[in-house]
C-alpha cells in the first residue's frame, strides 16, 4: 500500500461524516482505481462544502504531500488552505 493511498484512506475516514452518496461513491471508486489525487480533491471539496474540520496532523500530512506532488493542476493546494482543523 502506498503512502498516498494511506493518506487518502485517512482523509476519507476523517471526512466521512460530511459525505453524501455521490461523494462516497466518487472517493472510494477513485481510490480503488488508484486515482488518489482525484479522491483527495473530492474529499477536500466535500469538506469545504460542509465546513467539516479535519485533524490538524492529517492536514499537515496532506500539505507535505502537496508540496512534493507534481499533480496540483486543479488548485487543490489553494482549497486545502481553506480547510478548518480540529
Describe the predicted segments one by one:
Residues 1-86:
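C-terminal-biased regions
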